[in-house]
Amino acid sequence: MQCSIKQILSDATDKLNKIGISSPQLEARILLQHVINKPIEYLLINLDEQLNEAKIEAFEKLLARRLKHEPIVYITGVKEFYSREFIVNKHVLIPRSDTEVLVDVVFQCHSRESGNPEKKQPNPCFRGNDISENCNDKFLNILELGTGSGCIAISLLCELPNANVIATDISLDAIDIIKSNAAKYEVTDRIQIIHSNWFENIETQKFDFIVSNPPYIAHSEKSEMAIETINYEPSIALFAEKDGLQAYFLIAENAKQFLKPNGKIILEIGFKQEEAVTQIFLDHGYNIESVYKDLQGHSRVILFSPINLNRSYARRIGKSLSGVQKNLLDNKLPKYLFSKEKLVNEKRKVFLEIGFGMGEHFINQAKMNPNALFIGIEVYLNGVANVLKLAGEQNITNFLLFPNNLDLILNEIPSNSLDGIYILFPDPWIKNKQKKKRIFNKERLKLLQDKLKDNGNLVFASDIENYFYEAIELIQQNGNFEIINKNDYLKPHDNYVITKYHQKAIKANRTPKFMILRHVLGDH
């Protein structure tokens, strides 16, 4: 029995249409071209050609599979991704065009860091030579977690000849597929494929990029999904615990030890997950560098970088960090590390303390004002650890810490955003040639004034009399401030606690003085 191409396609289109296939005619053509191994164009110009019984029977078998809602790419065994055709089967997630945004972001980051920053947003249309020709020869190490078919890893290798990739997957069946795809595109010498549950079997080494399209669908969303996806794609690549967020928690908790100092994490997310995923990474001490949208305008890929704890500013006076202190800095500090993203949409009053020492005043202010947010700056890591200890003991959480130099944070704080600033007993830098190092100087006063809201308060305290009165003179000459307590500099501000430093000053016959300022309306 023979039948024409036209009749075969017509009958198949009708059957596919009846079960709700969105593009029945196209899918009928794809199945038939797969059987006869000819391009679709051949079918269209040879509609009257008669096919023999063997080919008709082969076509009917494939059509029967599609009529059961098996994805057409599993039937044909291939799927295009980033202008290349990848081998796929039921053991790997079907590559989606949305995931191409992730590949674009890697290329853009590499291009920017290589000295070609002209592309500000990933362009879904640029491919291949557009990137490799613009990038320098910097050697790249990339880790992909949960590689599946390998479409991400292999696309990166094909476009970046100076890259090596380690690709992991928990499924041995998936690993067979990525090996086939790596061989197909001749990149086996630059890819190491590891059977691993996330980071478990990865030797300690450092990567420029960690990338992943992890499972991110909540189990509660199954009822909303297509039959093709639910019944045929591997559930381990689709669904995750913790409302679909489990993988993001795991990556946030473990990735830092595998990143180079300027390394990046680039992750695909569900289109409703931007807020939840960014919060996970903020809580674990990462910067949110950029969020990228897919062609439908949904947030699809996020670029993260770790907030590196720069300990070079720490003053090791007396003794080095204890084991308890190191544990606090390593395990508790990331949650409370300052980043500008944490101030976005902040509705509470916000106060900044510069140089909080051992943190007695800082913690007391946070305790007495639980509905406000306190940001603390301190380069002395023993003091940072002590704040974390005191906060844990008193269940205080309304604070952020920046264990680094003041000048590195000022540009991160928005103008007109602070309700108050505390500068208590800063280093006076007595010698004339050192005075430019003072926290309270003309240049910084201008910056601090810009950050304060109108009517916001700035409190300055010092036990060095010359410094204190020089500060008053500085205010009178350069600041848009009103001195509230000009008749009584000995009286501290509200909720002040006498710190150990204050006590030492009194024992040394030095008198602590306080200047309480109100920022008056002026130009920012």
UniProtKB/Swiss-Prot annotation:
Domain of life of the organism in this record? Bacteria
Q: Decide whether keyword Transferase is in the record.
A: yes
Q: Does the keyword Metal-binding apply?
A: no
EC number(s) from the headed UniProt entry: 2.1.1.297, 2.1.1.33
Residue segments, region HemK:
1-306
From the UniProt entry, list the residue stretches annotated as the region tRNA MTase.
Answer: 311-524
The segments labelled RF MTase in the record are 1-308
Q: Where does S-adenosyl-L-methionine bind?
A: G146, T147, G148, S149, G150, D169, W198, N213, E353, E378, N405, D427
Q: Where is the active site?
A: D427
Renumbered residue ranges of the record's region tRNA (guanine-N(7)-)-methyltransferase? 307-524
> Which residues hold substrate?
N213, P214, P215, Y216, K431, D463
- Return the Pfam families for the record: Methyltransf_4 (PF02390), MTS (PF05175), PrmC_N (PF17827)
What's this chain's function? Methylates the class 1 translation termination release factors RF1/PrfA and RF2/PrfB on the glutamine residue of the universally conserved GGQ motif. Catalyzes the formation of N(7)-methylguanine at position 46 (m7G46) in tRNA.
Regarding protein family, the annotation reads: In the C-terminal section; belongs to the class I-like SAM-binding methyltransferase superfamily. TrmB family.
Q: What NCBIfam families is this protein classified in?
A: hemK_fam, PRK01544.1, RF_mod_PrmC, tRNA (guanosine(46)-N7)-methyltransferase TrmB
The identity of this protein, by name, is: Bifunctional methyltransferase
Q: Which organism is it from?
A: Rickettsia conorii (strain ATCC VR-613 / Malish 7)
Q: What is the lineage of its organism?
A: Bacteria, Pseudomonadati, Pseudomonadota, Alphaproteobacteria, Rickettsiales
- Tell me the gene name: prmC/trmB
